[in-house]
Amino acid sequence: MSNMDFLPISKEDLKKRNIDVLDFIIVTGDAYVDHPSFGTAIIGRVLEREGFTVGIIAQPNWNNIEDFKKLGKPKYGFLVNSGNIDSMVNHYTASKKKRHDDFYSPGGKSGYRPDRAVIVYCNKIKEAFKDSPIIIGGIEASLRRFAHYDYWDNSVRRSILEDSSADLLIYGMGEKPIVQVSNLLRYGMKIDSIKNVRGTTYIEKDIFSLKDYIEIPSFEEVSTNKKSYAEAYKIQYYEQDSIRGKTLVQKHKERYVVQNPPQPPLSQEEMDEVYALPYARTYHPMYEAEGGIPAIKEVKFSITSHRGCYGSCSFCALTFHQGRVIQNRSQDSILKEANMMTNMKDFKGYIHDVGGPTANFRHRACKVQEKHGTCKNKQCVFPKACKNLIVDHKEYLSLLRKIRKIPNVKKVFIRSGIRFDYLMYDKNDEFFKELCEHHISGQLKVAPEHISDKVLNLMGKPTRNVYDSFVKKYYDINKKIHKNQFLVPYLMSSHPGSDLKAAIELAQYIKKMGYTPEQVQDFYPTPGSLSTTMYYTGINPLTEEKVYIPKDQKEKRMQRALLQFSIHDNYDLVKEALIKAHREDLIGNGPDCLIPYNKPYKKSHKKNNAKNNNNHYNKNNNKNKDISKKNKKNSLSKHKKRK
C-alpha cells in the first residue's frame, strides 16, 4: 500500500493532495493504524466523509515542539487522544511497574508516548499554536471528564479539561458529536460557544443559563471527603443514558465542568456507514522497517458486530464510554466485511472474532430501552436476569452460519468473550452446541473472575452456582459432540471485598479445577469504574455499604499467590497467608491441602505436579497442561477482554 491509501501524515502528503491547510489534525498516542478498531482511524474517516481534510500526527516527540508543527496550523483545530488505551494503563502494570512493551507502537516497543498523553500533547499544542482550538476525546479523556481518583498518583485529580486546557471534550463514541461540532465550526461558530452538543463536556464560568441539571459534589469536596466522592460517582453512574440522563455539573474552584447528556446510540444504518468507510485496514507503511504494529495482528481479521454492553461488571468502565445500549451492524454489512477479508493477500481462512465488548450481546436488552432508556436503579442481568430481558441467540447464530458458508472461510472464532450467564438463560441449546462445535479451538475463555459470592456480588457478576452449571453443561455438550475441549477461566485477585478468606476459597476451587491458571489479573483501579470508586472510598456508592479493600501490598501478593498456589516460588507467601487466616488445615499432604508441610525442591515440585502428587492437579491435567503456554497474554490484553 502507498501513503495515498492513508490520511496525510506529512507536508509531502499534503502537496500530493493539493491541500494547503488542513481542517483538522488528529494527534494520537498510538501509531497510525487505519483500521476501524482504532478510534483515530474512525474519526479521521468520518470527518473525511463529511468533506473535511484531516491529517494525522501519530506519537509525536513530546520533547520537540517541531513535531507538533509538521502539518502546520489546522483551520478548525486539533483533535487529541491518548490512543486506544489510557496511557497510564498502557505504561504500568496493576502493581505500578513499568511495562516494557507496547502493542500499539512500532515493533511493540515502549517509550513512544508520554505518561498522561492527552495533557502533555495539549500543552505542547498550546505552546506551538496558542489560539488553535483543541478538542479531546478517546478513552483517556472520556473516563477522566469529572474529578476522578487516580491510582498512579493515589489522589483525586481534577477533570482532564482543567489539566489539559482543552476547549472541549467529546466523551463516549465520538462519531456523532464530532460531526456536529465540526459542522458548527465550519459554519463560523467559535469553539467556546459550542455548549449544546450531546456527548460533550466543557468548562463554564457560571451556570445561570443552564436548565434541568444536577450539580454533583465539587472537586474540592470529592478530593477531601470520600463520602462525597461516592455520592458524585453514584450520580454520574445513573445519568449516563441518552433518554433520561440529565446535564451534570461539577464545580472546580470558581469554574464549572458541564457534561451534556449522552448522544443517542448509533442506528444500525449509521453503524453500517461507519464500518464501510475506506480504511486501509493496516498500519501505515512508515512502520514497516521497525516491524510494524503488533496490535493489528489481533484485529486484522476480526469483525466488530456491535458496540455497548449491559453486563455492567463493576470493574469495567464501559458504561461510561460505550454505554449499556447495544448498537449493532446489519448482517449484510458484516458479511460484506467478511467477504472482503477473504480477498486480502494474507488471509489464511480464519476469521478471529465476530463480536463486541460481549460477543453474545447482539441486540438491545429489552424493548423498554427503546422508549424509556436504560433502567436507573437496576441492571439487566445482575443479580439475576430482569423479567424484560430478551434472551435469544438466534440472530447471532444465523449470522455465524452465513459467515461459515463464505468461500475460503475455514473457521470463524469467537474471541471477544461470551457472557456465560446470559448463555445459560437461553432455553434453546442450539447456539451453545454450535459454539462448541464450530467457534472455539480446543478451549473457551470465560470470565467467572471469582468464586466467592460476596466478592462476585461486588463485581456485578453471577453467583458461583451459575458458573458451576455452565461448566457442567459445557463439558456435557462437548462430550455429546465428541470433542475434547477445555475452559480457561479469567480470575481476579484483590478486588474490593476480597479478603484472605475469599482468596483461599478461590484457591480451593482452583485445586478442584485441576490446573494452575496463568490467566490471573490483580484488580487494577482504572478511571471511571464502580470498583475503582469502592477501592478509593471503601464504600459501595450504589448501596452506601462499607467494603473491605485489600490495599496492603503484602496481602495483595498473598492473594495472587493463593490463586497460583502450586507454583514453587509462591510457596512461602501461600504458607504465610494460610497461617495468617488460621487455615493450617490446608497445609500438609491430605487430599484437600494446598501445599505440603515443607517447601519442596524446585525440581521435585515440578515432578510432583506432573505425577499428580500432592493433588495439585486432577485427572484432567494431562489433557490440559499446555493450555497456559498456548494462551499466555500480557496483562493489558487480559484487562481488555474480561466479560
From Swiss-Prot:
Keyword match 4Fe-4S: yes
Highest taxon above the source species: Bacteria
SUPFAM superfamilies with a match to the protein in the record: Radical SAM enzymes
Gene Ontology molecular-function annotations: 4 iron, 4 sulfur cluster binding; catalytic activity; iron ion binding
Composition-biased stretches (Basic residues): 600-609, 630-643
This protein's UniProt keywords: 4Fe-4S, Iron, Iron-sulfur, Metal-binding, S-adenosyl-L-methionine
Name recorded for this polypeptide: UPF0313 protein CLD_0573
Start and end residues of each Radical SAM core domain: 295-566
Pfam families per the UniProt record, alphabetical: DUF3362 (PF11842), Radical_SAM (PF04055), Radical_SAM_N (PF08497)
Residues reported in the UniProt entry to bind [4Fe-4S] cluster: C309, C313, C316
Disulfide bond annotation, renumbered to this chain: none
Composition bias type Low complexity, residue spans: 610-621
Transmembrane portions of the chain: none
Region (Disordered): 598-643
UniProt similarity note: Belongs to the UPF0313 family.
Cofactor note: Binds 1 [4Fe-4S] cluster. The cluster is coordinated with 3 cysteines and an exchangeable S-adenosyl-L-methionine.
Cofactor annotation: [4Fe-4S] cluster
